[in-house]
Regions:
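Conserved donor NDP-sugar-binding/catalytic core segment of glycosyltransferases
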Residues: 95-128
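Non-catalytic, C-terminal membrane-associated alpha-helical segments of glycosyltransferases
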Residues: 243-312
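Glycine-rich, basic loop-to-helix element that forms the pyrophosphate-binding segment
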Residues: 58-75
Length: 312
């Protein structure tokens, strides 16, 4: 029988998020919680000890990519066949693990990634499921009862990584740290002919950013309201994706078009314009010159100044 594990990443979790972990223990074949908070969270340690849940403290080394790598390596060492990735705020439907276990059993010992449809609760709409020929993008028409559908990109939340896929694709890129980590992995899968599938029967609710709608005359604009640090990582890593994959897959330039749209959003409707636009500018520059890794390494003075402001 196919064994399906779950990997949950914590980062300054709330009490409610910690309490929710207890329900995961019997839903999957193996549960590993990675505490990615810089200093070990005593509440997480106590809760996991009480519930008999395996806990690994990783301390945000390598960002979200590092946490995924540490957790996946540990679970695959325990001979788990496939692992589902989750954020601490993921709301997992009861049908998720039985359905994904059937998907894994059907695909057998093959390299693959599979994920549910993602319903963005902020936008009250599904994220678009896309296919690509490397040059253009095409939106897929997904029917709820349809079989597995090949796609080009999956976000990490709810995504199942098979053991063979991890063997073929390797570790997530820790130099990216956070934003576009899953986008890069999708491009890597595309380049190595590892299939990605969306499971039409499964829907995972998810909140992306702190979206707000703004009226500008007769028009409406949506803003994400990410911090300047996230703007930095997003812009920098988008440049890296374009440089790394753009010649083979011109569609890898698209994340940079999203950066341009972020500039428009910030300039028109968001607060902290100066800091966010500066973050994007620094990110583009560092992406072009290959300065990767955490902000503390690439822009230590900027990171230190932000830390002082945060501490008051």
């Amino acid at each position: 029988m196919t064994t399906l594990g779950a990997l949950v990443i914590l980062y300054y979790p709330s009490d409610a998020q910690l309490d929710a972990l207890g329900a995961w223990r019997h839903a999957c074949d193996a549960l590993l919680v990675v505490d990615n908070t810089p200093q070990p969270d005593a509440r997480a340690r106590e809760m996991c000890a009480r519930e008999g849940i395996a806990l690994l403290h990783h301390g945000n080394r390598g960002g979200i990519a590092g946490a995924y790598n540490a957790g996946l390596a540990a679970l695959f060492r325990d001979r788990i066949d496939a692992v589902a990735l989750f954020d601490q705020d993921s709301s997992v439907p009861a049908a998720y693990f039985p359905a994904m276990r059937d998907v894994c059993a059907g695909l057998g010992r093959r390299a693959f990634l599979a994920g549910p449809r993602i319903f963005d609760e902020n936008a009250c709409s599904f994220l678009p499921e896309l296919s690509t020929n490397g040059i253009g993008l095409r939106r897929l028409h997904i029917e709820p009862g349809a079989p597995l559908q090949r796609c080009a990109f999956l976000i990490s939340s709810g995504c199942v990584v098979s053991r063979d896929a991890f063997d073929v694709l390797g570790r997530f890129d820790e130099t990216l740290f956070i934003d576009h980590v899953d986008t890069e992995y999708s491009f890597r899968a595309l380049s190595r002919n590892v299939p990605l599938y969306v499971v039409p029967s499964l829907v995972l609710p998810h909140r992306i950013g702190a979206k707000q709608r703004h009226a500008i005359g007769p028009f409406e604009m949506t803003s994400m309201n990410h911090s300047w640090q996230r703007r930095y990582y997003s812009a920098r890593n988008a440049v890296q994706l374009g440089m790394q994959y753009g010649l083979r897959f011109p569609v890898a330039i698209v994340p940079n078009l999203l950066t341009v749209w972020q500039v428009v959003q910030i300039a028109l409707v968001e607060r902290d314009k100066r800091a966010k636009l500066a973050g994007i500018l620094f990110g583009v520059a560092d992406g072009l010159f290959g300065r990767l890794g955490p902000l503390e390494r690439t822009r230590p003075r900027l990171a230190a100044r932000a830390q002082r402001v945060q501490q008051g």
